[in-house]
Amino acid sequence: MARYSLRKPTYEDIPRLQYFEQVEGKGTEIGLVLKSEDDWKYVIDTYEYFLLCVDNEEDGLVWGYILAAQVENNLWIREIFFCKEYRDDPEKRKNIKLEGFGGVENMPLYGAVKYAKERGGVVIAPIASDNERAISAMLGAYGFRHDRTIERWYDPKHLVIYIEDTGTKPYQNV
């Protein structure tokens, strides 16, 4: 079994999701809009692509998530969040990037690309202009392309929109 897996969230996950927003996401765009328990229930019940990242070697610890909404046949990424520990620890980060999910086809963002491609759509990923790690992943590993920049969206930061419209597997260029 792969170290990491994805699963759909349940209402029991809401305290962990609120912790991500209120504590781990403080000072980031994730923490700009804090969701109540009812808000999270609505998200769990209605969003078409919402998966939690689970560490199978740590008793099923939820360490991140990807949240996206289907707009027509496209997938609009609302949030991607990974705990600081999993972003910053070299071994855990290596596993996130490479075979930690048991192959690239099981990775959170590639799943979103596949989901959109199966519906004849694209993945739209808005990112704060100073989020260098996310931008690097979108451009380098996942082959997204820059679509447009909306100035001062996060005042004073810009919002940069990337699109993946090929459906290709990640890490082909690495």
Model feature map: region roles:
Residues T28-V54, L67:
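Active-site rim helix/loop that mediates acceptor-substrate recognition in acyltransferases
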